[in-house]
């Protein structure tokens, strides 16, 4: 989810972020403390617009499948007694679980917009308790929610937690509940008024003894896959290639950790069969590794270099770039470097088909070729983000206890499973190796515009600098122009 309440982009000067390096520990145990469950692709309308958000009986690894439909990742959980089913958007870029209530004006409208994600009714639960009325979260695009913090029973991945705190959106403009699993310091009640934090889901699992460390791994799988997986307290070596390499999370200039941000030290494009990479010149950039963002957002100047390398056409009205849908078959890869580990992203993961509009029409270029969204957008003045278009190509371990993220190339559609428990302490196994001399400071994004990038506005003539047959500009954008892209410039703030 783009941004949160620490609001990196409000600094008047470019701050430096720094950290000390510690190590992720992974322990092989006969009975690992890991909770795992699937995350799923869940069908929603206008998924890119929603960038607002954007089982283990005898073990302690908590596993959950992830739904993955139209670029949003969800998990299934229940709240209350008797259980009420919720599908919540998994978000490493925020920290609260919040859900809609059916009685809100938004959810009770004739279109029933909240039916897919589910709603929570406190009056129907015998274990509900009110905490306070202080829940208040909003996004720059105007969407958000206000309501109550409450406690109730939660059941996720077969694990039940009593008196678990979450929020109810009595007033909401989003149909989707969010399961934020970032730092407790990023919770809305902390960032809004400086209130004491509470144990969100990863911390509550540690507190209850279900996992040993406030850490989890994320495997989104490829764009066409219906499911991925999240493991709280563990990793699955069957889901990645090679070894995990560990880089530090960057802290703010105040010295605290509020978001899962690392130093992106290089971006390039792999063009040759020899594996050589043409790197775009850039200083290290602070980027959030954010599963709640469908697209990825790079500094304007860097995004411009990427666009020029793939002949993308930028539509400033929507803050989106377009490419021919046939580019999904291009064999080039964008390569993202983090001091040492790299994520190589194929074009088939970056080219997003919007599908037809309500009238069955599809976006096309003037030459008749079908137009698709390119999965990289300019960050403007907001913090840069690597969202699902990049994270699908990586296996990631978020270690909130040690303020680290471990990275390895993913194994798409792997059916192999070898679960290891994440323990406590330092340097316990070779599966996660600290990167020597990792970059520990980086610049926050600055808005510079997109110099040298071909632009196109729906309905305009092709740019005169290119022949009409070369100009790759969409004739129209499927309803996006009217609503904008909610993910652009998003951040949390108190209403």
From Swiss-Prot:
It is found in: Cell membrane. Pfam families: Asp. GO terms for biological process: proteolysis. Disulfide bonds: none annotated. It is a lipid-anchor; GPI-anchor. The active site is at residues 91, 290. One of its GO terms (molecular function) is aspartic-type endopeptidase activity. Glycans are attached at residues 76, 136, 413. Residues 468-495 form a propeptide. Its EC number is 3.4.23.-. Keywords: Aspartyl protease, Cell membrane, Glycoprotein, GPI-anchor, Hydrolase, Lipoprotein, Membrane, Protease, Signal, Virulence, Zymogen. A lipid is attached at residue 467 (GPI-anchor amidated alanine). Its main location: membrane. It comes from the Eukaryota. Residues 1-19 form the signal peptide. Residues 73-408 form the Peptidase A1 domain. GO terms for cellular component: plasma membrane; side of membrane. InterPro entries: Aspartic_peptidase_A1, PEPTIDASE_A1, Peptidase_aspartic_dom_sf, SAP-like. Residues 447-470 are annotated as: Disordered. Probable GPI-anchored aspartic-type endopeptidase which contributes to virulence. Belongs to the peptidase A1 family. This is Probable aspartic-type endopeptidase OPSB. It comes from Arthroderma benhamiae (strain ATCC MYA-4681 / CBS 112371). The lineage of its organism: Eukaryota, Fungi, Dikarya, Ascomycota, Pezizomycotina.
